[in-house]
Amino acid sequence: MLKFTLHKKDGLARRGTLELNHGKIETPVFMPVGTYGSVKAMNPQNLHDIKAQIILGNTYHLWLRPGLEVVEQFGGLHGFIGWDKPILTDSGGFQVFSLSDMRKLTEEGCTFKSPINGDKLFLSPEISMKIQTVLNSDIAMQLDECTPGETTREQARKSLQMSLRWAERSKKAFEDLKNPNALFGIVQGAMYEDLREESLRGLEEFDFPGLAVGGLSVGEPKPEMYRMLHAVGPILPEHKPHYLMGVGTPEDLVYGVAHGIDMFDCVMPTRNARNGWLFTRFGDLKIKNAKHKLDKRPIDESCTCYACQNFSRAYLHHLHRAGEILGAQLNTIHNLHFYQVIMAEMREAVEQGKFADWQAQFHENRARGVD
């Protein structure tokens, strides 16, 4: 089930509600990444506390470990991980195509070696849909071929055409499995505007309830990613949710919303947190730096997260330098809370018709830098 209601537009920025089998999501929304069924350094209560509405699970990794036979015993991923809100799963394609020296690609699918035990495995649109059906994610993704940003036009066109054929196979398999959830198509085309449009037009035939923009944030320069968003955002169908995969920094989220994107996921806030890189309203802070050793202030005095309300930069600096697990947890709570606050503020700004003003103030604040 998927029902998307668009409540308000302010320029291309959108404010909507997405109804799924495990609950409603207010958009625009950021989805924390739970690769193996857990958001690193967070438990489900932490996620509820920061007001996470939906999380992402990784089909490839969950297929390899713990395996479908385990998750199936719990009725799907929700029961296995103790999370009662919506879940989105990717198709597994990105991870498989990252194994460039360990895989063989054909029209049927992709053969690769398991990085865990060396077993020979095969992923096809049909198998990806089977895995995601067992996971019972609220939103599943079609299997597509993920092309790097530097792909030639000829390679990009050939790839997107195969992704369109795989989109058709994904949808048929999804329906044959009687999956009650939603399946999104993925717009590909590398860094070529006309190919992106060709991909989008090809997907229209299959009438997916939502569309994702894939193949960005894969090593291309930031201006190139923004150029593609500028080109693709305005032509995405208005009545469907728009998902930008694997992006990104706070600035990327704001640029995406300004160009019509409703949904985001990225490992950046969690990965950076574990490395002592904290996001704040006034720029980024590296908690490992020695200048924080005696600093009694919180990460951000305007932040209401658990870490900022209870602990000093000095303590977080100590935890990070000592390699304490609590340090990673508190840093992650802060970063994900900050991302959720940004999204909530953008939702409110669009509702009030003041998104451009909010955006200008956001950039001014971020450029100021942290004291």
From Swiss-Prot:
Pathway: tRNA modification; tRNA-queuosine biosynthesis. One of its GO terms (cellular component) is cytosol. The active site is at D90, D265. Zn(2+) binds at C303, C305, C308, H334. Pfam families: TGT (PF01702). It comes from the Bacteria. GO terms for molecular function: metal ion binding; tRNA-guanosine(34) queuine transglycosylase activity. Catalyzes the base-exchange of a guanine (G) residue with the queuine precursor 7-aminomethyl-7-deazaguanine (PreQ1) at position 34 (anticodon wobble position) in tRNAs with GU(N) anticodons (tRNA-Asp, -Asn, -His and -Tyr). Catalysis occurs through a double-displacement mechanism. The nucleophile active site attacks the C1' of nucleotide 34 to detach the guanine base from the RNA, forming a covalent enzyme-RNA intermediate. The proton acceptor active site deprotonates the incoming PreQ1, allowing a nucleophilic attack on the C1' of the ribose to form the product. Belongs to the queuine tRNA-ribosyltransferase family. This is Queuine tRNA-ribosyltransferase.
